[in-house]
Amino acid sequence: MPPENLRFSKGTEVLIPRVGEDPMDYNHCTWLSMPDVAIGEMISVFNTDNNPLFTATMFNATLQNEFAMRVEGGSVTNLYFEKLKNIEVSFPSIQEQEKIAAYFENLDHLITLHQHKCDELQKLKKFMLQNMFV
């Protein structure tokens, strides 16, 4: 694709997958926190003045069925942004969004730390088992 046809992020976009194999595949929204990242054609971009982390989390938690009802296609489904424009969503205040987003961000960090610890314990177990019967 020629560089002039690329879309670049501002760093606050919510990204919604446009292509999936199943209508329920569309609960993988995320937000792009970095500016100047090229965004592929198979991604719908939702620009918002709301907290993007909160928005992506809310979309994943509450709009999966709404998204699934709007997909088109058979073995490969498509979710076109035009089909999403008439979904009504209410947002709490920005302050509440910030608090909720921070809570989930901290929870994600905690999960990552525990996963890392679990991975290290698995390695230790493997090492101990290998050396136990030498």
What is the predicted role of each segment?
Residues 1-134:
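Feature detects amphipathic, helix-rich regulatory segments
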